[in-house]
Amino acid sequence: MALGPDRRFGMRVDTMTPAQTQAAEIDAGLRQYMLRVYNYMALGVAFTGIIAMVVAMNPAVMQAIVGGPMVWVLFIGIIGMGFVAPRIMMSKSVLAAQSCFWVYSAMWGALIAPYFYIYTQESIARVFFITAAAFAGMSLYGYTTKKDLSAMGRFLMMATFGILIALVVNLVFLQSSGLHLLMSIVVPLIFAGLTAYETQQIKSWYYEGDMEDATHKKSIFGAFLLYGSFVTMFVWLMQLFGVARE
């Protein structure tokens, strides 16, 4: 039966075909799924900010991070979570997936806590909104584009490994300000592209038609990916545009 008005008994009744009904249900389900992804991500960003402020108010912890090995523990922990968390999130329970996400967010918060001492509050707020605008634009593009971004995503994922190696080499051996400046420009561009790719991938996962538990874990994993891209962009843009305290 085609979509159209039914005027029997003086009443107008719109009907839809089964295919149209299914499409409407998919659209509603997709919106709910993506909203859950973005809600988790936003909560993760807020949690990171809270942890960063709490750590910044504790001089002993700050000293351990800035003047001790704790910064390397956090750095290695964050990198390790990037490899381990996806397996846990997709193979364990929803609670395990949530726990990984919150631990990851907390470690990032502790790592960037020194920013409250290094940079002015105005520049932190400004760079945060710049990052949010760039993230929103690229995520919207990834969600709406009909172009397959898989090839771009694979290339950018390979580029992140190169960036990671260059970062470690520069921190430990070279300590080159020029290379650091170059990375501050390149890294946000890479993760902006990854934001679009990840959004497209996260959207495609919904159409796999999993049970609610699996879909919930996918939304947490999707938030984990987008959160990582957002925070990485913010960190490097801070080093590029942040204004140091006098």
Model-derived regions: residue spans:
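A hydrophobic alpha-helical transmembrane-helix feature that marks the membrane cores
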Residues: 2-246
